[in-house]
UniProtKB/Swiss-Prot annotation:
It catalyses: N-terminal L-glutamyl-[protein] + L-leucyl-tRNA(Leu) = N-terminal L-leucyl-L-glutamyl-[protein] + tRNA(Leu) + H(+); N-terminal L-aspartyl-[protein] + L-leucyl-tRNA(Leu) = N-terminal L-leucyl-L-aspartyl-[protein] + tRNA(Leu) + H(+). HAMAP family: Bpt. This is Aspartate/glutamate leucyltransferase. It is found in: Cytoplasm. The keyword Cytoplasm applies. Transmembrane segments: none annotated. One of its GO terms (biological process) is ubiquitin-dependent protein catabolic process via the N-end rule pathway. Its EC number is 2.3.2.29. Belongs to the R-transferase family. Bpt subfamily. It comes from Polaromonas sp. (strain JS666 / ATCC BAA-500). One of its GO terms (molecular function) is leucyl-tRNA--protein transferase activity. Keywords: Acyltransferase, Cytoplasm, Transferase. One of its GO terms (cellular component) is cytoplasm. Functions in the N-end rule pathway of protein degradation where it conjugates Leu from its aminoacyl-tRNA to the N-termini of proteins containing an N-terminal aspartate or glutamate.
Length: 254
């Protein structure tokens, strides 16, 4: 394995993608900065990249690199100081009966069908609601870092695992857990997404890891603004992680 001391981040190469339609802000164009070569980005280097605002999508490690827009703000939750609010406590209590099973990344038809139901129910027309098996696999099941798949099932009266309700993909970093992607049964009343974040915070606590990285907070995007509800949290501004109430901050978008 190539260690960071043998492969400092300065030796990695970074390129900017061509502009493409932004997935979160209608009418905006986005660009990404991608770290290469991907086959040399193992867990230690990847952990440092995440602390510098990068994320992972399959084999690609990237961060926003948009022209004239700084709406995507990296956000992380300090595990020791996190305090759940009333709605988060309700979500935690409501789903305590679910059984979580931590697996290596693997393809299961049941997971894929849930993914399609989620995309069609929550993000219809977003471009991912007709993903093929290959697209699903490349997006979520390919990784060279310490990644895990967590499936959540309801508990039957006899204690056995029942219907699949949610799947989370996460990366275990040197200093925390990075929430990669979560999909679930598209019941807007169930608060599955909030429960997934709470579960990952609890896992980080048990592993004695200080942070849970929630990716990018975007104030103008209802899809992403929920992340500001996990408090206290820190945001990455000018290369520094800063305690902040993200809900009061309005990043530059033009």
């Amino acid at each position: 394995m190539t260690h960071l001391k043998d492969l400092p981040l300065q030796t990695l190469q970074f390129y900017a993608t061509a502009p493409y339609p932004c997935s979160y802000l209608p009418g905006k164009q986005a660009r990404s900065q991608v770290a290469t070569p991907s086959h040399l980005i193992h867990n230690d280097a990847y952990s440092e990249l995440v602390t510098n605002g990068f994320r992972r999508s399959g084999m690609f490690t990237y961060r926003p690199y948009c022209d004239g827009c700084q709406a995507c703000v990296p956000l992380r939750v300090p595990v020791k100081s996190f305090k759940a609010d009333r709605s988060q406590r309700r979500a935690w209590s409501r789903h305590q009966g679910m059984q979580a099973r931590v697996l290596k990344l693997c393809f299961m038809p049941e997971h894929y069908q849930l993914y399609l139901r989620y995309q069609n129910g929550r993000h219809a027309g977003g471009g991912m609601d007709h993903d093929s098996i290959d697209q699903y696999t490349q997006f979520l099941l390919q990784s060279r870092v310490n990644s895990r798949l967590v499936e959540f099932r309801e508990s039957l009266p006899n204690g056995e695992a029942g219907a699949l309700k949610m799947v989370s993909i996460l990366d275990v970093l040197e200093d925390g857990i990075s929430a990669v992607y979560t999909f679930y049964e598209p019941d807007t009343r169930a608060s599955y997404g909030n429960y997934s974040v709470l579960w990952q915070i609890e896992q980080a606590r048990r592993l004695e890891l200080p942070y849970v990285y929630l990716g990018y907070w975007i104030a103008q995007s209802p899809k992403m603004n929920y992340k500001a509800g996990f408090k206290p949290h820190e945001i990455l501004v000018n290369g520094q992680w800063t305690p902040s109430d993200a809900a009061t901050r309005r990043p530059k978008t033009d």
